UniProtKB/Swiss-Prot annotation:
Keywords: Glycosyltransferase, Transcription, Transcription regulation, Transferase
Job description of the protein: Regulates the transcription of the pyrimidine nucleotide (pyr) operon in response to exogenous pyrimidines.
GO function term, MF aspect, one: uracil phosphoribosyltransferase activity
Annotated protein name in UniProt: Bifunctional protein PyrR
One Pfam family hit: Pribosyltran
Record's catalysed reaction(s): UMP + diphosphate = 5-phospho-alpha-D-ribose 1-diphosphate + uracil
Gene from which this protein is expressed: pyrR
Cross-referenced CDD domains: PRTases_typeI
Alphabetized NCBIfam families for the sequence: PRK05205.1-1, PRK05205.1-3, PRK05205.1-4, PRK05205.1-5
Lineage: Bacteria, Bacillati, Chloroflexota, Dehalococcoidia, Dehalococcoidales
Short motif PRPP-binding, span: 98-110
Amino acid sequence: MAQKVILGAEDIRRTLARIAHEILERNHSSRDLVIIGMYTRGVPLANRLAENILRFEGLEIPVGTLDFSLYRDDLDSQRFHPTIKNTDIPFSINNKIVVLVDDVLFTGRSTRAAMDALIDYGRPKAIQLAVLVDRGHRELPVRADYIGKNIPSSRDEKIKVRLTETDGRDEILILDNEAGEV
């Protein structure tokens, strides 16, 4: 297997609709809810979740974007050179329920870095994590509150999420080590 499509565009649409319903159910359509997307692909996912919530409940949820690259624990690595993006959180997160959104949960290190960055913007009532894919292999004690799809994978495999906003189409692929980038 060089690459295999795990989810297509319609599957992703349905998955995000389900996650939006789960967020509403857990938080009782709370007006204290804000959604923040983690760069890169968490940003369009956050926007789509907010659009679904607006469509389902008529509730307009504030959406922000978070660049956590300077909070990563591999900054001293020779192979990692961060491209700084714009954090845009034009609202207070104090006493808010923050739903942090990412495309793939793997080791938990990006989530830890994002939470560290987020705390610099205020003191949320709670932070919940929504991910499109959970692939396992945690190195830190991090668990998602909302999971689109669990995709068990080996460490040698790569999960590639493509979204229309960033990649021109919606799909989730699993690639073996020899497949490289596509």
